[in-house]
Regions:
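Substrate-engagement module of ASCE P-loop NTPases
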Residues: 102-113, 149-150
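Short glycine-/polar-rich loops that comprise or flank the Walker A/P-loop
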Residues: 5, 112-116, 156-160
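Short, solvent-exposed loop/turn segments at secondary-structure junctions
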Residues: 15, 85-87, 123-125, 169-170
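Hydrophobic/aromatic beta-strand patches that form the interior of the parallel beta-sheet core
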Residues: 8-10, 116-119, 162-164
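ATP-dependent small-molecule kinase phosphotransfer cores
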Residues: 13-95
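Post-Walker A helix-loop "phosphate-sensing" segment adjacent to the P-loop in P-loop NTPases
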Residues: 1-9
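NTP-dependent small-molecule kinase module
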Residues: 125-184
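Conserved phosphate-donor/acceptor-positioning beta-strand/loop module used by diverse small-molecule
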Residues: 77, 81-84, 110-130
């Protein structure tokens, strides 16, 4: 709102293609399952199944990035992803995918890069107060993985911002984001 532009919020991926469980269970049942189940609870351990699942969702990114670009970006919208492709790199288990990071990382090279990428994190105890999806060890591992990923991605470019922000205080976090956007 401070930038005086319309905003659209997308979750995790463009969602041009439905989640896979919609194809097998139907839309309502899949939606109920998504709401009632915690992330990272899938039982998939197969490389082939993971590769097929990842390929399906990657296709959604490949096609969807252009749909989002023409539908929103060119019309002046600010597009905010709550999560993005980075989950496939660092937390593919969340999508019931078990693949080496090298495979999912390569895929990022062929996607349009958001101009600004912010990883908002907090210490494990704060996160556990908000929601109990993961244990403290997993939260710490994921936080370290995302911080490391963002540091490495930032080293590869000057045209895209990859910034990790400790999200302890909302006002400070928002101020940090706005300053970063205005500065660029």
């Amino acid at each position: 709102k401070q930038l005086r532009k319309p905003v659209v919020v997308l979750r995790h991926r463009p969602s041009i293609l439905p989640i896979l469980s919609v194809l097998t269970k139907g839309k309502e049942k899949a939606h109920l399952d998504t709401i009632s189940n915690l992330p990272r609870q899938g039982k998939n351990g197969s490389f082939l199944s993971s590769l097929l699942r990842f390929s399906y969702y990657y296709l959604d990114y490949l096609i969807g990035q252009f749909v989002i670009y023409f539908k929103y970006i060119l019309r002046g919208y600010v597009v905010i992803y709550d999560r993005y492709y980075f989950d496939f790199i660092n937390d593919s288990k969340r999508s019931n995918i078990v693949l080496p990071k090298s495979i999912t990382t390569i895929g990022y090279r062929f996607l349009l890069k958001p101009e600004f990428n912010f990883f908002l994190f907090a210490d494990a105890k704060t996160i556990l107060k908000r929601k109990q999806e993961l244990d403290e060890t997993t939260i710490n591992e994921l936080t370290n993985d995302y911080n490391f990923l963002f540091q490495n991605l930032q080293l590869t470019t000057n045209s895209t911002v990859y910034k990790s922000i400790n999200n302890e205080d909302l006002e400070t976090t928002l101020s940090n984001i706005i300053k970063t956007i205005i500065k660029k």
